[in-house]
Amino acid sequence: MSARKKNRIHVFFVSIMIIISLVSGFGEGIKQINYKDLIKDTIPGCTSKNPKECVKVPANTYHRGCEISTRCHREQHSSSG
């Protein structure tokens, strides 16, 4: 390859990289999270004076599903002694 052809290829790729960076918004700056936004994510009533309010209730409690060994039937406990 001649030096002139290599130079054109380099200019082409540099031009493409500049265009891509302008279109993608590279260098616009990153928004920072401030402390006020972090305060909004707290549980209402959860303070150092009232720590019992800070406990979260699980959304879905665990329950055991169907088991192959019991053929999906629940065991009945007999009260005969």
Swiss-Prot record:
<dbReference type="GO" id="GO:0005179">
    <property type="term" value="F:hormone activity"/>
</dbReference>
<keyword id="KW-0732">Signal</keyword>
<dbReference type="GO" id="GO:0019722">
    <property type="term" value="P:calcium-mediated signaling"/>
</dbReference>
<feature type="signal peptide">
    <location>
        <begin position="1"/>
        <end position="29"/>
    </location>
</feature>
<dbReference type="GO" id="GO:0040008">
    <property type="term" value="P:regulation of growth"/>
</dbReference>
<keyword id="KW-0372">Hormone</keyword>
<dbReference type="InterPro" id="IPR008801">
    <property type="entry name" value="RALF"/>
</dbReference>
<dbReference type="Pfam" id="PF05498">
    <property type="entry name" value="RALF"/>
</dbReference>
<keyword id="KW-1015">Disulfide bond</keyword>
<dbReference type="GO" id="GO:0048046">
    <property type="term" value="C:apoplast"/>
</dbReference>
<feature type="disulfide bond">
    <location>
        <begin position="46"/>
        <end position="54"/>
    </location>
</feature>
<feature type="disulfide bond">
    <location>
        <begin position="66"/>
        <end position="72"/>
    </location>
</feature>
<keyword id="KW-0964">Secreted</keyword>
<comment type="similarity">
    <text>Belongs to the plant rapid alkalinization factor (RALF) family.</text>
</comment>
<dbReference type="GO" id="GO:0007267">
    <property type="term" value="P:cell-cell signaling"/>
</dbReference>
<protein>
    <recommendedName>
        <fullName>Protein RALF-like 7</fullName>
    </recommendedName>
</protein>
<comment type="function">
    <text>Cell signaling peptide that may regulate plant stress, growth, and development. Mediates a rapid alkalinization of extracellular space by mediating a transient increase in the cytoplasmic Ca(2+) concentration leading to a calcium-dependent signaling events through a cell surface receptor and a concomitant activation of some intracellular mitogen-activated protein kinases.</text>
</comment>
